[in-house]
Amino acid sequence: MPVSAPADVFGFNYDGSWGTSGLDVWHHHDHGRMSIEVARGKKYFPEWNTARWWLSHEAFQRDPERFLANFDAGLAIFASHGISVIPVLFNRWRDPFCDFGGVPIDHILPWASSWTRSDDLFEDASRGASDVTPVERLFGEYVDAVVAGHAGDPRIFAWDLCNEPLMGRYVDDPESELRAAEVKWLRWVAQRTRLLGAEQPLTIGNYANTTAIELTEPFTDIISFHPYYMWSGHESQPHMATKEGFVEFLDEVSAFAKLKGKGLIANETVWGARDHSTHVEVMNYTLNQLVPRGIGFTVHALHHSLVADLHRDQYGPVGNAEWMHFIEPDGSLRPGHEAFNDFAQSQRASRAD
């Protein structure tokens, strides 16, 4: 059955195994390989009901028709397994170890480049192509093409407007021009999506920062965030590097969501590890904190991939997150990771007793 509420979300992020970036994954999309990888996930995790699927506006710009055809075909793959989808429209997480690609800050900051020469950049989502800057036109064409054709698509549970925006110290500075510009752009994406008649809820995949969550809440319908308990985390981030801080952070975000009357999804969670048992231990601890609070989740991530954080060392640069994937390149499940099924809907009642 399709997922019906944020608290019921049980699943994974998905990036195809064959690419090193969003552009690479989508420009060289492999429908057959995707079919195999999603089927593997459903075999290992029968109650998997939601996939957070990363898109690429850069790939769309290079071949719009092919991108849209692959997007629709991919939705069909997920639907054939009873999996609802949260497409991620844009990305602002830029990893220096193995950059996924996405939106650079100079594309959303007024006058920061030749393509953003406007004092009122992203001021009005309803303006036509002849009245806007090049970047507004390009982003608008992408959002229009992707959302308009699926505005009422029951295969889509929600639209994630952007992955991890506001991911810098400036987010806590009310006077920051960067912060103001980024929030304005995010609001523009939300407005554009609603103007297209999207019937699905809107959300934003915020990293673990309460200010970012508070800034993006007014123009989203579901609060999404990325609660990672980081066993290898830095002391400068105690809300992720310590269990005490992690619990306090979850309680703070849960209280905020309740205050606003909105559902809550951890649409990225479970920090990685090269060691299988360490990864399983982190998974068990993290999900044991999320489930009692009624927080749905899409763990990062389902399958080994060449993109950042999802591959073994021999496949490319590996950062602090080490290995976050559940399924190996040969299709086998990492040892002990079947424990993810203990957190499925059918198991939650017994766990609560």
What is each of the regions a protein language model found here?
Residues 2-220, 226-229, 260, 293-307, ...:
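Active-site mouth of glycoside hydrolases
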Residues 57-59, 270-274:
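Short histidine/acidic/glycine/proline-rich micro-motifs that form metal-
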Residues 290-298, 330, 338-353:
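Catalytic domains of carbohydrate-active enzymes that cleave complex glycans
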Residues 204-205, 265-268:
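Active-site neighborhood of phospho(di)ester-bond hydrolases with catalytic His/Asp-centered motifs
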Residues 275-289, 309-317:
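Histidine/acidic-residue-rich catalytic or RNA/ligand-binding cores of hydrolases
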Residues 65-72, 244-249, 279-285:
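Charged helix-capping and loop-helix junction motifs
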Residues 233-253:
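Substrate-binding surface in catalytic domains of secreted glycosidases
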